[in-house]
């Protein structure tokens, strides 16, 4: 099984699939904001940034998946984005499951001064005046943070499997002059 995932990680199509799934999640977030009129909170903006990290990881991995450094850079970005996004989604769910005055998110995103994403791309990363503990949308009884917990858990699980497969030896390629 690990050899299958090792071969998959050496294939450009798998990395483009990761980028496509992340792009689809970003596109659905934009649809929720502009199509359905749901205003994103600060945690939603952070979760969007984690999904954007997954998109970048897929594109970096698709550049040259057989090159060791490119593949490992993409894997590190994938792992960081998946686990950070999972932690953010769990915290967002905690805000909604246990609302209280002392357990609230910030009003303004706290990006580093060198990368103010909310100023560079305000149409995507600028939050609206909404509290993170408000449930704005549900599907099958699950809110947006619960669906993101599921999505980031799948991303994290796949990352762990692909990471473990990197330590699997590749099949030796016997080359013969007389073949």
Curated annotation (Swiss-Prot):
Periplasmic side: 32-49, 91-146
Disulfide bonds: 41-44, 105-132
InterPro entries, sorted: DiS_bond_form_DsbB/BdbC (IPR003752), Disulphide_bond_form_DsbB (IPR022920), DsbB (IPR050183), DsbB-like_sf (IPR023380)
Membrane-crossing segments per the record: 15-31, 50-65, 73-90, 147-165
Keyword Zinc on entry: no
One GO location term (cellular component): plasma membrane
Membrane side Cytoplasmic: residue ranges: 1-14, 66-72, 166-179
GO-annotated molecular function: electron transfer activity; protein-disulfide reductase activity
Intracellular or extracellular location(s): Cell inner membrane
HAMAP family: DsbB
Family: Belongs to the DsbB family.
Protein name, UniProt field: Disulfide bond formation protein B
Primary gene name: dsbB
